[in-house]
Amino acid sequence: MRPTGRLHLGHFFGALANWLKLQQEYDCYFFVADWHALTTHYEDTSSIAENTLQVAMDWLAVGLDPQKSTLFVQSQILEHAELHVLLSMITPLSWLERVPTYKEQIENLKGRDLGTYGFLGYPLLQSADIVMYGEPKQDLLVPVGEDQAPHVELTREIVRAFNFAFGFSVKIPNDIDTRNLIREQLPETDVAPPKTPPLVQQAFDDHLRRDFREAARKAMTEWGYENFREKMGANAKFFTLTSVLQEPAYIPTETPRLPGLDGRRMAKSYGNAIWLTDPPDEIRTKTRNMLTDPQRVRRTDPGRPEICPVFAYHKLFSPPETVVRIDRDCRSAAIGCVDCKKEMAENLVKWIEPIQARRKQFEANPQQVWDILDTGSKQAHKVARKTMKRVRNAIFQWDEARQSSNPARAGKVATGE
């Protein structure tokens, strides 16, 4: 989540409510994405630190538990930037340009200088953020809304390309039957005939290896490794793919409809938000001016709760029996919009009271919040270091090089950590 400052009800129901459930079931990593904030607002960084504190306070106030989840700040884990750079080496520009939100944000943020790699490449940084905390052969799950699903799909493609580039190896078989099978499945490749002289055999093998790598790269990027192995059948025995990075899967996040005060999506830029920190009287004032059913002009006109933003709030903050009554009385014009808003506002105030009470405790001791973020950053750093050691070795083969240059030390590992 970007450090935009205090959070509003849209943040809670759009993300935080789901996070509270996930932390009960999974090892969760939640971070303040301060680097991502630079992709669209690099010209003014003066508020990032304070906004980071405000976001973290709201996280803790709604119930994110540092004993159950790892809470940290993105820029404190430098490995995110390193992995971002390494992923950029194998990611075509066209993959980034086709991300749906790329053109949408350009349209929505007119007037800003968005002609930077930071803006174009932010989905790639997002991919690094995701896969940093994955372990090969273990589920890596990302909770996202429908609009963010393409980002996870992009990450899956990038991981496939990366694993192929640095984890794929081919060993050309010597037996004639397997070579003939390769010829049948890949007729465009050159498979050396029997009794070929060694040097010619090597040339054929090199050519076959190149052809097969390219065909395999395209297939694995499209299908995924396991599906590729299944389709290759018997030929799967002469190649291996080491999963350096784990492909993520996304958990669809179902978010209840919570419009802003004017009926549009709740957003800071629209000025239509109710903040988690709004005092009770401010909540009452804001909700008093909420948009309602535009066809209900007079008090005696029947209403349509299904299109009324106020009723959407009732469904989230009022008791079930109240929701049933409001639905009935609105349709029959037994209750007017003014009274309906008042009742909803009081229920909203009751719902938000414990959140604000917890937040006041953290406001009185902001150092506690920084300490929680620092502790979380240290925990995240341990995982990131492990991931990057695996990544660096896959790309540069540092461990093998050191051991081969000093046979006496092979199999012995010393560390100053």
Please state what every model-predicted region is.
Residues 82-85, 94, 100-107, 111-193, ...:
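Classical nucleotidyltransferase
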Residues 1-3, 34-36, 136-137, 270:
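Short, histidine-centered active-site or binding-site loop motifs used for metal coordination
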Residues 40-41, 136, 265-266:
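Active-site-proximal beta-alpha loop/turn segments in soluble metabolic enzymes
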Residues 11, 150, 158-417:
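Conserved nucleotide- and phosphate/pyrophosphate-binding catalytic cores
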